[in-house]
């Protein structure tokens, strides 16, 4: 009887310990799960806060908003700003505000706002999906990736179309090599041919498969920007050795600007047939969309662009 009772008591104690261990394991698992969920929420909240503003500088963001309101006041008729009634993320709205604040009035009246919103979303997608996206500083992305217009070309949906064709071609490359590869792709699409003074749109250049230097450089800048590579068109109105002009492209790579001949691929950047004339050029300039405060010498500031 004693042994039987003892065994029962021991069994009871063992059972209690087993239950205790199970309960403790469940409690620990619940604590770990809750801690994981809390950490996930905190990280997600931090990420949301980090992506909340397209323009992180409060002063500059306020200046852009004031310029946007002035543009709205100048165009009170019609539904020219109806795209802002759509549901969009806060960073998308700030980017759209930036574009509308400084784009020419003709671009507001001639094109539907959905075109600009689609371009913004494609730019943000490229920044996320391209391996160099996180390395592009905010101001460089704002002035040299986001803008749709390059020169005086007609605007089109080239950014979205070019991205789908180029994304897999450049994904495994460094930013430097991606610039070279995009220029090879541009050479496959467009060759140099003199044309009239009107600048064709990027898609029109692909359709005709030719263009003068101003059209080739407009096309190449659009292609580079489509995959999140900062790019700008550079223009000289007159060479030192001849009464002629030229336009080419500069691309931003890891903190430096490199030049390249548009649709004229070379094995490295900072190499082109115009190297010599460019070093002796009297004037080379580019028009940067919006109010730009970079290290370059500023030649002029207008309501829509900064000439450097």
Regions found by a protein language model. Give the residues of each.
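Hydrophobic/aromatic-rich core segments of domains that either
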Residues: 166-169, 173, 178-184, 193-203, ...
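Sec-dependent N-terminal signal peptides
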Residues: 34-43
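Bacterial Sec signal peptide processing site at the extreme N-terminus
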Residues: 49-58
């Amino acid at each position: 009887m004693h042994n039987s009772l003892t065994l029962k008591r021991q069994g009871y104690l063992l059972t209690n310990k087993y239950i205790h261990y199970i309960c403790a394991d469940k409690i620990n698992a619940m604590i770990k799960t809750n801690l994981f969920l809390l950490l996930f929420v905190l990280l997600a909240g931090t990420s949301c806060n980090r992506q909340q503003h397209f323009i992180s500088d409060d002063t500059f963001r306020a200046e852009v908003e004031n310029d946007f309101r002035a543009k709205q006041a100048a165009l009170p008729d019609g539904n020219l700003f109806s795209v802002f009634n759509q549901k969009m993320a806060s960073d998308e709205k700030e980017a759209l505000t930036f574009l509308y604040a400084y784009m020419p009035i003709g671009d507001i009246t001639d094109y539907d706002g959905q075109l600009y919103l689609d371009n913004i979303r494609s730019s943000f997608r490229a920044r996320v999906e391209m391996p160099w996206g996180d390395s592009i500083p905010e101001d460089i992305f704002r002035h040299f990736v986001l803008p749709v217009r390059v020169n005086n070309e007609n605007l089109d949906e080239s950014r979205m179309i070019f991205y789908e064709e180029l994304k897999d071609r450049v994904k495994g490359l460094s930013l430097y090599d991606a610039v070279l590869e995009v220029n090879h792709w541009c050479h496959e699409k467009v060759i140099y041919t003199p044309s009239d003074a009107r600048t064709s749109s990027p898609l029109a250049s692909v359709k005709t498969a030719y263009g003068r230097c101003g059209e080739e450089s407009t096309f190449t800048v659009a292609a580079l920007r489509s995959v999140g590579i900062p790019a700008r068109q550079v223009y000289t109105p007159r060479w030192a050795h001849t009464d002629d002009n030229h336009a080419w492209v500069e691309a931003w790579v890891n903190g430096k600007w490199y030049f390249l001949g548009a649709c004229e691929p070379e094995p490295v950047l900072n190499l082109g047939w115009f190297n010599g004339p460019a070093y002796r050029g009297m004037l080379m300039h580019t028009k940067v969309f919006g109010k730009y405060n970079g290290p370059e010498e500023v030649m002029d500031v207008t309501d829509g662009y900064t000439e450097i």
